[in-house]
């Protein structure tokens, strides 16, 4: 049987978890096997910016950061389950990637 590997990425931890919960509910309703959600390492992007606009004075910096949270879910590729997965409303800032594997 084929498996579907679902990779979720997003900057908001709560939104990523709600999408994971919806996928888990679909798997329970359809009765397919589910592995995950497996938390992947969080990527932390840091951008230091100099506070002073002219370069004079003390070297003080602002540090801006963005964290990208990732989850991995393996689910059996049942036709009914995949149709329901396609109907999930995913927020705009959440990336979802589905790969079918045999």
UniProtKB/Swiss-Prot annotation:
Tree of life domain: Archaea
Keyword Ion transport: no
UniProt entry keywords in alphabetical sequence: Ribonucleoprotein, Ribosomal protein
Record-linked InterPro entries: Ribosomal_uS10, Ribosomal_uS10_CS, Ribosomal_uS10_dom, Ribosomal_uS10_dom_sf, Ribosomal_uS10_euk/arc
Any one biological process term the GO annotation gives: translation
Any one GO MF annotation of this record: structural constituent of ribosome
GO cellular component: small ribosomal subunit
UniProt-listed Pfam families: Ribosomal_S10 (PF00338)
Signal sequence segment: none
Assigned protein family: Belongs to the universal ribosomal protein uS10 family.
Function, in words: Involved in the binding of tRNA to the ribosomes.
Subunit structure: Part of the 30S ribosomal subunit.
HAMAP family: Ribosomal_uS10
Protein name, UniProt field: Small ribosomal subunit protein uS10
Organism: Methanoregula boonei (strain DSM 21154 / JCM 14090 / 6A8)
Underlying gene: rps10
């Amino acid at each position: 049987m084929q498996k579907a590997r679902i990779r979720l990425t997003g900057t908001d931890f709560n939104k990523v978890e709600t999408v994971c919960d919806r996928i888990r509910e679909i798997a329970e309703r359809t009765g397919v096997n589910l592995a995950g959600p497996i938390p992947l390492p969080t990527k932390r992007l840091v951008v230091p910016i100099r506070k002073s606009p002219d370069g004079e004075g003390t070297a003080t910096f602002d540090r801006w950061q963005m964290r990208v949270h990732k989850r991995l879910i393996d689910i059996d590729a049942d036709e009914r389950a995949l149709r329901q997965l396609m109907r999930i409303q995913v927020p705009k800032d959440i990336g979802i990637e589905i790969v079918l594997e045999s």
